[in-house]
Swiss-Prot record:
Known function: An accessory protein needed during the final step in the assembly of 30S ribosomal subunit, possibly for assembly of the head region. Essential for efficient processing of 16S rRNA. May be needed both before and after RbfA during the maturation of 16S rRNA. It has affinity for free ribosomal 30S subunits but not for 70S ribosomes.
NCBIfam families, per the entry: 16S_RimM
Record protein name field: Ribosome maturation factor RimM
Location of the PRC barrel domain: 95-169
Gene3D superfamilies per record: PRC-barrel domain (2.30.30.240), RimM (2.40.30.60)
Keywords associated with the record: Chaperone, Cytoplasm, Ribosome biogenesis, rRNA processing
Lineage per the UniProt record: Bacteria, Bacillati, Actinomycetota, Actinomycetes, Mycobacteriales
Record text on subunit structure and interactions: Binds ribosomal protein uS19.
Record-level GO BP terms: ribosomal small subunit biogenesis; rRNA processing
Main location per the UniProt record: cytoplasm
Entry comment, domain topic: The PRC barrel domain binds ribosomal protein uS19.
Protein family: Belongs to the RimM family.
Compartments, as annotated in UniProt: Cytoplasm
């Protein structure tokens, strides 16, 4: 299974530098100078390998220069490229209360009394903390704060997350 660790948002400047939205908790390792990344090109363009030549932080995003991308036109053509890693290459997590996002995506969510809420479609990382984006009935999105007071148990074996939502949380949309 492949996991997205970043996305090219846009070109930055005229020398081929790219603004990358980071979707990994270890950007220093993933996007280190000399790293080789697999990028899935937008609009069915296939995949390509990218070698990081330089990297710096700017306004909450990484600005990265890749080998072979030397001007704005070349950089613009890469907008929307997703950087992927194979989940088998990820190190195991030793803490039983920590999970990779992809382990939670697809799990059923139910309340403590067993009522079905929906399925986790993605884990959102926001400045205020992590949220579980849960698709409920009629494809309605419910954002559940990923905190121990609400998310009471996670069973990867049973593919279930149990929540104890505060009053009104499930009524918001």
């Amino acid at each position: 299974m492949e996991l997205v660790v970043g996305r090219i948002a846009r070109a930055h400047g005229v020398t081929g530098e790219l603004s990358v939205e980071v979707r990994t908790d270890d950007p220093d390792e993933r996007f280190a100078v000399g790293s080789v990344l697999t990028g899935r090109l937008p609009r069915g363009g296939g995949s390509r390998r990218f070698t990081v030549e330089s990297v710096r932080e700017h306004s909450g995003r990484l600005l990265i220069r890749f080998a072979g991308v030397s001007d704005r036109d070349a950089a613009d053509a890469l907008r929307g490229t997703l950087f992927m890693v194979d989940t088998t290459d990820l190190p195991p997590i030793e803490d039983p209360d920590e999970f990779y996002d992809h382990q939670l995506e697809g799990l059923a969510v139910r309340t403590l009394d067993g009522a079905a809420v929906g399925t986790v479609s993605e884990v959102l990382h926001t400045p205020g903390g992590e949220l579980l984006s849960v698709r409920g009935s009629e494809r309605r999105e419910i954002l559940v704060p990923f905190v121990s007071a609400i998310v009471t148990s996670i069973s990867l074996a049973d593919k279930v997350i149990e929540i104890d939502p505060p009053e009104g949380l499930l009524d918001l949309s």
